[in-house]
Amino acid sequence: MTQTDAHGADAERKERPPRQHPIVAGAEPIKLGSMLFTLVEPRRGHEVAYNRWYERDHFYSGCMIGPYNFAGKRFVATADLKALRDPDPSEITGEPARGSYLSIYWVLDGYHDVWNRWAVDQVKALHRAGRMFEERDHVHTLLYRYAWERSREADGLPAELALDHPSAGLVAVFADRAEGLDAAEFAAWMRDEHLPSLLPGTPARLVVAADPLPLLIDAPGDVPRTEADDRRQLTLWFLDSAPAEAWDTVVSAHRAAVEGSGKGRVVAALPFIPTIPGTDTYTDRLWSADDPGAAS
């Protein structure tokens, strides 16, 4: 008698034939090379359905099953976290309440182009199959090239493990370096001078910096074209505490140092906490009653 699993499929399954994107496994070290940062706003009244669609289907079918995509994680910004945003509104989110769900994916160094071509083709295939979710809007979806990292400890959390580590919070900070300032000079100040002074004794375990990359010309049309500004840098701050507990000692102090140095300005600091997979937790806490567009 044929055994079946929980989905009713034959226990003895046949392998699917290879498609146009074969994975060629090499002996390269596991190093972060690039990332996808996608900040999305579900439309009011569709937040539960959006959360379930994304975590049960799109998180995997849109990225995680792709070649050289070795880590991913989802985060959420509740209304109380959005109230911390600085400045608000910002050049990244526009209206204060936008950008409730963030997904970040790590791509293996040296394989960005292979992964990117697969990702665009895959999302187009999902569109054709009716497996996308119409009731949501992209707020900031862009690719980033890994630049550098700085850990609080001498032998601390490496970037490659950051999305798997159980961080209590995350802050995405977008900063523009001063006009005429060389990128290498700004990076050296951040990595070798500013952060070694700021991080000790704070909840900020790791900072990962990344520079914007352009989307492919044939990227899906529902993703707004965001120009890759070469003066703008994204830093991801992985926290041991809730963002509110780290805001003054980490985020505000960082902004004051960057702008006080004359080397740049912070254009957005956006706090998040991890989602809880398999639950609807936080879907009822995305917006406050006085947010623009809140249900009456």
What spans do the regions from the language model cover?
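Macromolecular interaction modules
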Residues: T2-S296
